[in-house]
From Swiss-Prot:
CDD domains: SIS_PGI_1 (cd05015), SIS_PGI_2 (cd05016)
Protein's name in the database: Glucose-6-phosphate isomerase
Keyword Isomerase: yes
Family, similarity comment: Belongs to the GPI family.
PROSITE patterns in the cross-refs: P_GLUCOSE_ISOMERASE_1, P_GLUCOSE_ISOMERASE_2, P_GLUCOSE_ISOMERASE_3
HAMAP family referenced in this protein's UniProt entry, alphabetically: G6P_isomerase
Entry's localization field: Cytoplasm
GO terms for MF: carbohydrate derivative binding; glucose-6-phosphate isomerase activity; monosaccharide binding
Pfam families for the chain: PGI
Pathway assigned to this chain's UniProt record: Carbohydrate biosynthesis; gluconeogenesis; Carbohydrate degradation; glycolysis; D-glyceraldehyde 3-phosphate and glycerone phosphate from D-glucose: step 2/4
Catalytic activity: alpha-D-glucose 6-phosphate = beta-D-fructose 6-phosphate
Amino acid sequence: MLTQLKTYPKLLKHYEEIKEAHMRDWFSKDKERASRYFVQFESLSLDYSKNRLNDTTLKLLFELANDCSLKEKIEAMFKGEKINTTEKRAVLHTALRSLNDTEILLDNMEVLKSVRSVLKRMRAFSDSVRSGKRLGYTNQVITDIVNIGIGGSDLGALMVCTALKRYGHPRLKMHFVSNVDGTQILDVLEKLNPASTLFIVASKTFSTQETLTNALTARKWFVERSGDEKHIAKHFVAVSTNKEAVQQFGIDEHNMFEFWDFVGGRYSLWSAIGLSIMIYLGKKNFNALLKGAYLMDEHFRNAPFESNLPVLMGLIGVWYINFFQSKSHLIAPYDQYLRHFPKFIQQLDMESNGKRISKKGETIPYDTCPVVWGDMGINAQHAFFQLLHQGTHLIPIDFIASLDKKPNAKGHHEILFSNVLAQAQAFMKGKSYEEALGELLFKGLDKDEAKDLAHHRVFFGNRPSNILLLEKISPSNIGALVALYEHKVFVQGVIWDINSFDQWGVELGKELAVPILQELEGHKSNAYFDSSTKHLIELYKNYNQ
C-alpha cells in the first residue's frame, strides 16, 4: 500500500516544506525551469513546468515508483502475466498494436498470430466497403456506418473517428448509438437508407442489454424496409466472441470479428472494436494509429522515469491526489476534433482506478482516482474556468493542443493557441491584490472603490497544469496520445496497489435492474425493493396504464 512504502513519509515531510511555495517565485528564480521540465517524444511534447514541484519532489516520486517495483510491473504487463488478479487474466491491449516479432504465449495461444489474423480480416472487409465492392441488397454502395455498442465498444471508436475526421472517407457518414433511450437509435435511423447502411453490433458476449436492445430495434427497422430477413447478412456485422448468438441474430459467421478477454473494453479500440475506425479511416491510417500507440508503448517500457511521459504524468497526479488532497482532474483539449476526448478519458481513468480495495483485498486508507471531467477548453473558459481560477478547489488541468493551423481559417488558430498559453500562465502566476489595485487606480477609479473591488480581482494562482502539445491531429499522434493516458492510468494503479483492469462497480446496478424491469413490464418479482424504489415503480406503472 502507498502509505506503507518507505518513501511515503519522506514525501509527506517534503509536502509540508513546499506546500506554501508559489510557482511564480520558482519561475522567477530558475530561468531554466521551463526547459528542464519539458519532454519531447516523437511529435508529442509535455511541458510540466507549471506544477507545484521541484527537483526534490521528482526525486522522491521516482523513489516511490521504485518502491512499488514499477519497472518490473510494466514488464509483467507487456509479457502477458495475469496482472488482472480478480479475473485471472492477462492485460494485453499492447499486443494489439505490437510491431515486434517475438510471440507472446498465453495459455497455449499465440497472441500476436491471433491478433494479426483478425487484423487481416478487418483490412479485407474495410477495403471492400471503402472501395464500393461490398454492396447492399439493392446493389447500392454503403454510405452510412452505424456502430451500436456502449462503454468501451462505443467511446473509443467515437472519439477516434471524430478526432480524425479529416482523414475519413468522403462517402461515408459515421453514426454511433449507445444509449438505450430509444430516442437516439430512432433519430439515427430516420436519416438512413436501409439499402446503403451497414450496422456494426459491438458486444463481446452479444448479450449486453443496451446494445442488443438497440441492435434488435435496428434489425426490425431494416427488415420492415428491406422486406426480407435474408438481407441482414449484407447489412449487419458483429464484433463478438459469441458465434451462436451472432448467427441467431442473422449475421453470417464470416462477418463476425473476434476479440479476447485479455482486452478490456476501455482498452479495445485497437481491436476489432475499432472496425468502424478502420472502415472510416482506411487500413493505412488505422495502421498509423496502431504505430503511434506502439511507439508510446516502447517509450513507456524503455525510457528512464525522468523522461518517461506516462510515468511523469502518473506520478504528478499521485502527488496532487495523495498529498494536496485534490479530488478532481480536468481534461481541456483546445481542438474541436478532440471534443469527445474528455469523456473517453473519463471512462479510461475512473473505470480503471475508481477502486477502494487493494490487490490483497484490504480497504485502502487513501484516495485513489479523482473525478475526471472536461470540455473543449475555449468553451470551458466561458463556463467553469471561473471556479478554477477563483474557487476553493485545487483542480490540476491537462491542456491539450496542436501546433498545426487549420486550412482556410486564417487567424483562428493563433487566437486559440494564445488562449492555451494565457490560461496556463494565469493559473500559474495569478494576480496579487497590489497588482489588481494598481490596475484599477490606473483606470481612474476612486481609491476607496478600487480598494474594495481589488479583492474580487485577485487570482491566487499556483494552480497546476500540464500542457500536452501535438504537432498536428494525425492518426499516429492520436494513437500515441491515447496510449500515453492508458499507461498513466496503469502507473497510478501500481502506486495505489489496485487492479486497474476489472470493473465490478458496474455490476450491482445491472443486477438490481433485472427484477425492476420485470415489475415495469407487468410481471411480479420476488425481489425486495426499498420503499422509495417501490413507490417509483408504482408511479411509473400508474402513469403508463
